[in-house]
Swiss-Prot record:
GO terms (BP aspect): ether lipid biosynthetic process
Recorded consequence of changing H616A: Loss of activity
Transmembrane residue ranges: none
Variation of activity with pH: Optimum pH is 7-8.
Function: Catalyzes the exchange of the acyl chain in acyl-dihydroxyacetonephosphate (acyl-DHAP) for a long chain fatty alcohol, yielding the first ether linked intermediate, i.e. alkyl-dihydroxyacetonephosphate (alkyl-DHAP), in the pathway of ether lipid biosynthesis.
UniProt source species: Cavia porcellus (Guinea pig)
This protein's pathway: Glycerolipid metabolism; ether lipid biosynthesis
Name of protein: Alkyldihydroxyacetonephosphate synthase, peroxisomal
Description of how the protein assembles with itself and partners: Homodimer.
Length: 658
């Protein structure tokens, strides 16, 4: 009975796919929703129906997506998190995020964010202008120039093996050799990459972009690449900040950009085991949106949630801001399917834990596209929390704030998210405060400032602020909140209000747009991260920030750089630290060289002070010069041996890590 019902559900879901084989604009959203519910139902009844369901839908998708040198695609609707084939119709080709979202200074000199996607969109931020002028010494009348559009004649030509192309056409896997599609997938979002897009061009870009729609498509692509000795560079959301997507300049083989964005479905949800089986190209925001319809979430929320994908999370060992409740990606993944040149890697069962030698999953997690393509994954889900509350705490200084976070970690009572900003980062956040709506609100803000700085004696140039996010059962959240604030009080912390905490988290998804604004005014900057033991956190933060200031001064940067940090994740034995640095490069002949030398010096300082090479950004090509010393010669040799066995002819040749 259950098998028959599940078979009917699977058949209906497959039929829905066939019926919706037209463009995205022709699809009925109610029909799509019904199809997802049928997949959920089939998951309940059979537990693991994905094999038959995936094959049926894969065939339907391939039939609907005939191979073409210039595939057309309808941009995703604003409420959808699906990345379209033609990414440039929805997203910036030479900057961060959506085309309709951009920071600018209006006629009154107030900062605004265009579009309607974010809570800050259309909101006037009146104090930012003074902050950016005072911090960087810039003249707002001096603006840089950049290329307004991509000129195909400026891009390297596409060189594709003709025999491969002939066989590819038989598979009906969609592809493109157009310059804009190839350039869009030739980079991530490191400062160097964006700078090149604005003012130059990459020496090497993919020769062809392929859009598989299911696991079987990926198997065919990898087999063809092995047959013709081609290079594959997988891409998910394209949010890499480690040069992970940059094509090796001396690669002479045809380079395939294998774009997983059309592998974006939840294949089933199992409410008994609280797991969901998903395709690896689904973005974080789309995954959360669909799960929310059924009352669930993963809780995995990296800052790149809008665009990064499940496959990208796994391949870089990602971390989310609410890991204190839900865990990092290594805690969430139950099962995965990976296509390699040697074949498919997949465990035979989905048990919660196994003692079967070294965990095969951990060979894939953090492999950064060097071993194969992650096509599907089973991940843990949780019921959507019933209650969420923000908060903030002001400390007299950064050191006392760190001591408080250490005690919270020791007592294992950290909220879903806790972030501690140093003073400069607090000042930056304060510069992004919206215009007050009334005299009364302004008066209250003045009272709060007076109370903290005059009555309690906090120095405005020393104080540090922690933002908090609690979620779960309402009664437990309120108890948890009291426990955290009681600990904070022992370290001189003062409750600074729910609004300040919420505003801090509202900036999470728009802060990346700020770099594009800076580039317009001769400001280049970047963020980078590390993790360190608790007893090294304060010294590491101080020494790295000072090293950045010293390096910039020695290299001729005329105005002191912005050099700031925050503690953004806490653990029993240490913390993750995020650094931001930026400087005014006007008058410097080679700003990229100065930037890269300063960033490298900061990384050297991190390692010298007991920090890790990376907490969650990964290694890529940007940091691989330090990998061997980080994991030892023997450890490095082990990684290389795995690579040599799984991919002996270097089909996955992005040259990350090794």
């Amino acid at each position: 009975m259950a098998e028959a019902a599940a078979a009917a559900a699977a058949a209906a879901a497959a039929g829905e796919t066939s019926a919706s084989s037209g463009s995205a604009a022709e699809r009925d959203p109610d029909q799509d929703r019904a199809g997802r519910r049928l997949r959920v139902l089939s998951g309940h009844l059979l537990g693991r129906p994905q094999e038959a369901l995936s094959t049926n839908e894969c065939k339907a998708r391939r039939a609907a997506s005939a191979a073409t040198a210039a595939p057309t695609a309808t941009p995703a609707a604003p409420e959808s998190g699906i990345i379209p084939k033609k990414r440039q119709e929805l997203m910036k080709w030479n900057g961060w995020g959506y085309n309709d979202s951009k920071f600018f200074l209006n006629k009154k000199g107030q900062l605004e964010l265009t579009g309607k996607r974010y809570p800050l969109s259309g909101v006037a931020l009146p104090t930012f202008k003074d902050w950016i002028q005072n911090t960087f010494g810039i003249n707002l009348d001096h603006k840089t120039t950049s290329k307004a559009s991509l000129n195909p004649s400026d891009t390297p030509p596409s060189i594709v093996n003709e025999d491969f192309l002939h066989e590819l056409k038989k598979t009906n896997i969609s592809y493109s050799q157009e310059a804009d599609d190839r350039v869009f997938r030739a980079h991530g979002h490191c400062l160097h990459e964006i700078f090149l897009l604005r003012e130059g061009m990459f020496e090497r870009i993919p020769d062809i972009v392929l859009w598989p729609t299911c696991h079987d498509d990926v198997v065919k692509i990898v087999n063809l690449a092995c047959k013709y000795n081609l290079c594959i560079i997988p891409i998910g959301g394209g949010t890499s900040v480690s040069y992970g997507l940059m094509c090796p300049a001396d690669e002479t083989r045809t380079i395939i950009s294998l774009d997983t964005s059309q592998m974006n479905r939840i294949l089933w949800v199992d409410e008994n085991n609280l797991t969901a089986h998903v395709e690896a190209g689904i973005t974080g925001q789309e995954l959360e949106r669909q799960l929310k319809e059924s009352g669930y979430c993963t809780g995995h929320e990296p800052d790149s949630l809008e665009f990064s994908t499940v496959g990208g999370w796994i391949s870089t060992r990602a971390s989310g801001m609410k890991k204190n409740i839900y865990g990092n990606i290594e805690d969430l993944v139950v099962h995965m399917k990976v296509v390699t040149p040697r074949g498919v890697i997949e465990k035979s069962c989905q048990g919660p834990r196994m003692s079967t030698g070294p965990d095969i999953h951990h060979f894939i997690m953090g492999s950064e596209g060097t071993l194969g393509v992650i096509t599907e994954a089973t991940i843990k889900i949780r019921p959507t929390p019933e209650y969420q509350k923000y908060g903030s705490v002001a400390f007299p200084n950064f050191e006392q704030g760190v001591a408080c976070l250490r005690e919270i970690a020791k007592q294992r009572c950290a909220p879903a998210s806790i972030r501690l900003m140093d003073n400069q980062q607090f000042q930056f956040g304060h510069a992004l405060k919206p215009q007050v709506s009334s005299i009364f609100t302004s008066f209250l803000d003045g009272l709060k400032k007076f109370y903290i700085t005059k009555f309690k004696g906090f120095d405005p140039n020393q104080l540090s602020v922690a933002t908090l996010l609690f979620e779960g059962d309402r009664e437990k959240v309120l108890q948890h909140e009291k426990q955290v604030y009681d600990i904070a009080a022992k370290f001189g912390g003062l409750a600074a209000g729910e609004d300040n905490g919420q505003r801090g988290y509202l900036l999470t998804y728009v802060i990346a747009y700020m770099r594009d604004l800076g580039l317009e005014y001769y400001i280049i900057g970047e963020s980078f991260e590390t993790s360190a033991p608790w007893d090294r956190v304060v010294d590491l933060c101080r020494n790295v920030k000072e090293r950045i200031r010293r390096e910039c001064k020695e290299k001729g940067v005329q105005f002191p750089p912005l050099s700031t940090c925050r503690v953004t994740q806490t653990y029993d034995a240490g913390a993750c630290i995020y650094f931001y640095f930026a400087f005014n490069y006007r008058g410097i002949s080679d700003p990229l060289a100065v930037f890269e030398q300063t960033e490298a010096a900061a990384r050297e300082e991190i390692l010298a002070n007991g920090g890790s090479l990376s907490h969650h950004h990964g290694v890529g090509k940007l940091r691989k010069q330090w990998l061997k010393e980080s994991i030892s010669d023997v450890g490095f040799g082990m990684l290389k041996s795995v690579k040599d066995y799984v991919d002996p002819t270097n089909i996955f040749g992005n040259r990350n890590l090794l």
